[in-house]
Curated annotation (Swiss-Prot):
Organism of origin: Mus musculus
Pfam families hit by this protein: V-set
Subcellular location: Cell membrane; Early endosome; Lysosome
PANTHER family linked to this entry: CMRF35-LIKE MOLECULE 1, POLYMERIC-IMMUNOGLOBULIN RECEPTOR
Protein name in UniProt: CMRF35-like molecule 3
Stretches assigned to the Ig-like V-type domain: 19-124
């Protein structure tokens, strides 16, 4: 009573039994932009027949993508190639430059009169793994340019870099920024000395020289006193006639 269903099962395409003219993997996977290879094995009696690789869910209406010429010559159509090894009775199908749309049901087949021996293969395509490259950029504060002689007081608040935001390559940049700040402070100190300290010293020196300058005496009072004494002396030397008596 069960013999007829069992015999019918043996002739269904895609089943993996010893009586199948052609067999292969039931499922294969490939990665997007990559390639995959499918090996289909056949009985020695099918050595001189054409082998093919077709696509479609229904075996009777699948689209043949590539087919051999009954020899061992490699045949390639677009992104699919096939080669028949008639010594080991294996034909190999290679799909290159895989796309997500390539995921479908395919068939290993042998061309013959009547119904072709076929084997069903389910092809899965995995998405391409993208690699993200992380880059670290350092932000450099613009330099301050002094364009005027007017001095202004500037408060510099240094920021402490953290190890998370500054890597090994940024340490040199931080050192350069520190040297620039030190150079800027030195320039401000020099300008203070030139425009404040030096004029102040010159003013003090001028004041000292002014105080210690030589004093010239025009002596109006002294000259008058000398002249008075001289007049008295001359009057004493005069002789009057009454004095001789």
């Amino acid at each position: 009573m069960w013999q007829f269903p069992a015999l019918l099962f043996l002739f269904l395409p895609g089943c993996c039994t010893a009586q199948d003219p052609v067999t292969g993997p039931e499922e294969v996977s490939g990665q997007e932009q990559g390639s995959l290879t499918v090996q289909c094995r056949y009985d020695s009696g099918w050595k001189d027949y054409k082998k093919y690789w077709c696509r479609g869910a229904y075996w009777k209406s699948c689209e043949i993508l590539v087919e051999t010429d009954a020899s061992e010559q490699l045949v390639k159509e677009n992104r699919v190639s096939i080669r028949d090894d008639q010594t080991d009775f294996i034909f190999t199908v290679t799909m290159e430059d895989l796309r997500m749309s390539d995921a479908d049901i395919y068939w290993c087949g042998i061309t013959k009169a009547g119904t072709d021996p076929m084997f069903k293969v389910n092809v899965n395509i995995d998405p391409e793994i993208s690699t993200t490259i992380m880059t670290t950029t350092a932000t450099v504060l613009p330099s301050t340019v002094l364009t005027s002689t007017v001095l202004t007081s500037t408060v510099l608040t240094p920021t402490t870099p953290t190890t998370e935001s500054i890597g090994t390559e940024n340490i040199g940049q931080v050192t350069q920024n520190s040297l620039f700040i030190w150079s800027l402070l030195s320039s401000i100190s020099f300008l203070l000395m030139v425009f404040v300290v030096v004029p102040l010293l010159l003013s003090m020196l001028s004041a000292v020289l002014w105080v210690n300058r030589p004093q010239r005496h025009y002596g109006g009072g002294e000259i008058g006193l000398v002249e008075t004494h001289r007049s008295d002396a001359l009057d004493g030397e005069k002789h009057f006639p009454g004095d001789e008596k």
